[in-house]
Amino acid sequence: MSQSVESRTRIKSERYESGVIPYAKMGYWDADYVIKETDILALFRITPQPGVDPIEASAAIAGESSTATWTVVWTDLLTACDLYRAKAYRVDPVPNVADQYFAYIAYDIDLFEEGSIANLTASIIGNVFGFKAVKALRLEDMRMPVAYLKTFQGPATGLIVERERMDKFGRPFLGATVKPKLGLSGKNYGRVVYEGLKGGLDFLKDDENINSQPFMRWRERFLYSMEGVNKASAAAGEIKGHYLNVTAATMEDMYERAEFSKVVGSIICMIDLVIGYTAIQSMAIWARKNDMILHLHRAGNSTYSRQKNHGMNFRVICKWMRMAGVDHIHAGTVVGKLEGDPLMIKGFYNTLLAGETEINLPQGLFFAQNWASLRKVVPVASGGIHAGQMHQLLDYLGDDVVLQFGGGTIGHPDGIQAGATANRVALESMVMARNEGRDFVAEGPQILRDAAKTCGPLQTALDLWKDISFNYTSTDTADFVETPTANV
């Protein structure tokens, strides 16, 4: 049960006897707290400073992320303080790690503005990460109540509508990022788009840092890219697209670029995570109003999500971005060049795609989550993947994903079209083997070799990249498995 009236009265009396008292005694720790359905829950990994009790550290985090300051203030008496104080209610030691603890904290829903990621984050991650009582702090997971989720739009388009719009079913989407990401002229850029799409890809995309530089202004890029899309679509008889990056210095500039992308016929536009939560939500609202797919590149996330003891787990970003309303987000490959533990990435993908998730500690899911019918976000796998890994990608990531082969398309010795064809044939041969009931994971290399007998570009790709892998142990691994998993 929650604290009794007598207990609360005693605590209130005690806290006004002195200027500074421990957070736990101020009401920010309640081991008997009964969680409400409407509470927002957060799970922090805390590393207290030497000599700081983990319960006091947890209470301090609860206090500083809700109503507290460093000393008693009499104006607390003018508010419903017992309601508005966040409550740390559980502290568990992190398995097999000394001096780290998982702190569970509950926040009343009325502490947050409806439909605002900016307001949510101002409390949850706004000030507490610099707090001296903790040596390090990491936000691992959150649970959003249905009542709160219903105040958010969610993905502008969603997976189901995107498949219908693209007329692509029963397999992952195929894409590639234009390379080199910087330096091409508009005409050459458009040629890359055309070649990749004509060779069999569904999408080409801008990279995170191509905006409107002196070597190629944004209008030039948009026009040449869409010329490539239209010509390739006509030649292939398929619906195709190119992610036009509308990221810019101001919202006015982004709206202008997004409107132009719509005018020239694009079905999808792109933004970067670094534009900020308010800008992301604003663009998601625009995308839904204008019937556009919205792709989000997670540029900058590893500055705070990669280290295991401080920052924020990427699964939290996945949750916030599903609420904010993006349709795509880069979420890891497992086998590529970027950070990606298999169990962690499975948790990211489930967060983006599932209507409801249960507690799954090996995947880092600390709370059950009902997504209140918000649409699905399509995960994007990119960074160091190639055709020879197709069986692993299909096994780890499933069908509901965009597989993006940048260097694995444009680096093909026989040209961009050949690289795209190699990836398309590799994917379709693997999907066919799976649908026939074969053990496509164990037989994957042989399935690819058989397909390559009638596809020269695939054979060339397999020969070129057969020895390429990125076998590094991930820095962010599961806490609840015996042996940390690694890239394979």
Curated annotation (Swiss-Prot):
Substrate binds at N127, T177, K181, R298, H330, S382. InterPro entries: RuBisCO (IPR033966), RuBisCo_large_chain_AS (IPR020878), RuBisCO_lsu_C (IPR000685), RuBisCO_lsu_C_sf (IPR036376), RuBisCO_lsu_fd_N (IPR017443), RuBisCO_lsu_N_sf (IPR036422), RuBisCO_lsuI (IPR020888). Binds 1 Mg(2+) ion per subunit. Keywords: Calvin cycle, Carbon dioxide fixation, Chloroplast, Lyase, Magnesium, Metal-binding, Monooxygenase, Oxidoreductase, Photorespiration, Photosynthesis, Plastid. The active site is at K179 (proton acceptor), H297 (proton acceptor). Coiled coil: none annotated. It is found in: Plastid, Chloroplast. Its cofactor is Mg(2+). The modification N6-carboxylysine is found at K205. It is an enzyme of class 4 (lyase). One of its GO terms (molecular function) is magnesium ion binding. GO terms for cellular component: chloroplast. GO terms for biological process: reductive pentose-phosphate cycle. It comes from the Eukaryota. The record marks K337 as: Transition state stabilizer. Disulfide bonds: none annotated. Belongs to the RuBisCO large chain family. Type I subfamily. Heterohexadecamer of 8 large chains and 8 small chains. RuBisCO catalyzes two reactions: the carboxylation of D-ribulose 1,5-bisphosphate, the primary event in carbon dioxide fixation, as well as the oxidative fragmentation of the pentose substrate in the photorespiration process. Both reactions occur simultaneously and in competition at the same active site. PANTHER family: RIBULOSE BISPHOSPHATE CARBOXYLASE, RIBULOSE BISPHOSPHATE CARBOXYLASE LARGE CHAIN. This is Ribulose bisphosphate carboxylase large chain. The gene is rbcL.
